[in-house]
Amino acid sequence: MPDKQKQLRVISLFEHMTSINTPLPRDQIDARLHHLGRLPQGELFSCFHEEDLEEATELYKILYTAKDFDEVINLAKQSRTFVNEGLFVYAVSVALLHRDDCKGIVVPAIQEIFPDRFVPTETINLAVKEAANHPDQDISVHVVETGNILDEEYKLAYFKEDVGTNAHHWHWHIVYPATWDPAFMGRMKDRKGELFYYMHQQMCARYDCERLSNGMRRMIPFSNFDEKLEGYSAHLTSLVSGLPYAFRPDGLCLHDLKDIDLKEMFRWRERILDAIDSGYYIDNEGHQVKLDIVDGINVLGALIESSFETKNKLYYGSLHNWGHVMMARLQDPDHRFNENPGVMSDTSTSLRDPIFYRYHRFIDNIFQKYIATLPHYTPEDLTCPGVHVVNVTVNAKVPNVVTTFMKEAELELSYGIDFGSDHSVKVLYRHLDHEPFTYNISVENSSGGAKDVTMRIFLGPKYDELGNRLQPEQQRTLNIELDKFKATLDPGKNVVTRDHRNSTVTVEQSVPVKKLREEGGVAGEYCSCGWPEHMLIPKGNHRGMDFELFVIVTDYAQDAVNGHGENAECVDAVSYCGAKDQKYPDKKPMGFPFDRVIEGLTFEEFLTVSMSCTDVRIKYTDIK
């Protein structure tokens, strides 16, 4: 079957998911699907909730093992009529992304499938009215602002509510499902636990950089399960349930749920910390297994999330996942009022809530306790023999000054919402963006021949919220990765130039459904997992916020991974998302060299000849 026909059939699967379905008679439903439908339609699905995730896993395994593409589509069409809407989209997306006969097929962007998860209720209500008043024409409405200056977090709405960042979080959890069974699926998810740690750690670092950009103090991590939480209102209404995502008033605390109680959360945290302090964990058979320096953080990632690969779920529990569920349900913990949960229940909405970042910094601090037990890097560990980084500059309109600004974009609503006509209904909104820039890295190679190296680029704030110079260890967990790539150095002097658009952290904007319909997919492989390109760097401020650009060069011969091909699929954003069906393409720990505690009190003590630290400024302007 031609790819265009396949693409059109996939598009039809997800269209108007917010509309009511007409159930099929049971005798017309494949027997493999008869046990599904336990989570009713109209409820909010959560991939953090064990029962929801269990049913979703059953469905994606059925679809994944279907004999051919036609059977996948037929099974999906049948299941759509009675399976929960959110669960359906999650499970079908996982199956399609991983089937060999779906290569080149693009799953429609989650923001077009469920625009109600990204667009405020007030804006959708306005769009509905405009479409009803003008049924014979295309409609465009501007997004309605839902916050105000009484809430300090409103300054960060451009970051927390960004369509691309929230879609990234949803897509990452589709690429890395917590229940992924490598033996059953026949595909590896290499270093999945470490990726869970690193991707979320980087989101927290980026959030703190945005706070500093807006003159705010760095976040205060969530610290105990009895503390009172800040309030939050998402101004989102689920069109599947007809109910708003729950509002959280100031001062509420977490409560026991029917599925889990707070005492278990305390126990799980203490058991994980005990494993870190003792240097070993207890596996399913009760054996003590050492947390080794190579795989320790990967093991901890699986324990904390927890994923299928957790070593002892009964003992170490599911600290991360149940934390999300508890945060989402604290305003109606026993479900007596039949309210929707809050946005923390869903991967496509949770980034909007400030507690997401505080809770993930709490999770990250557990990882940091483990990192503190690892040996520090020596100067030899941070030196690439024969390679000297002479100078690094950022080439923008003004050297070493990158300008950011707000840019208008649009989101189509009519694919996800049935407005009763064939006309387009769009929301116009603004997102952060930045001017194009390149890195110019001057390097001397005295090794005596051509040398393959890995270039690693990071950005970190220079000062804290009080204007104090950050020490290397303070800055370490605030550094954000910008790029990581292979380069070949000729003997002598070299200048390596790298365009920011080639970053291995980011992906371009998702392909609109309209374009998919017209072109039948995209040329080559588009994997969608990655941080949005327009959010690569923080906002900065009007004066020009001081950052430091770190570049370290390492020996590619020591970094290269056996079994990872140069032509691997889905490598456009390997730093956060890995490579499809292959080993993670870098032997170094994720975040190297900032994955270990830094001893030196000054950067002069930390830097080696193979590293560079350059002052750069990020300047925000109201005019593009």
Swiss-Prot record:
The keyword Magnesium does not apply. InterPro entries: Di-copper_centre_dom_sf, Hemocyanin/hexamerin, Hemocyanin/hexamerin_mid_dom, Hemocyanin_C, Hemocyanin_C_sf, Hemocyanin_N, Hemocyanin_N_sf, Ig_E-set. Cu cation 1 binds at residues 169, 173, 200. One of its GO terms (molecular function) is oxidoreductase activity. GO terms for cellular component: extracellular region. It comes from the Eukaryota. Cu cation 2 binds at residues 320, 324, 360. It is found in: Secreted, Extracellular space. Keywords: Copper, Disulfide bond, Glycoprotein, Metal-binding, Oxygen transport, Secreted, Transport. Belongs to the tyrosinase family. Hemocyanin subfamily. Tarantula hemocyanin is a 24-chain polymer with seven different chains identified. Hemocyanins are copper-containing oxygen carriers occurring freely dissolved in the hemolymph of many mollusks and arthropods. PANTHER family: FAT-BODY PROTEIN 1-RELATED, LARVAL STORAGE PROTEIN/PHENOLOXIDASE. This is Hemocyanin E chain. It comes from Aphonopelma sp. (American tarantula).
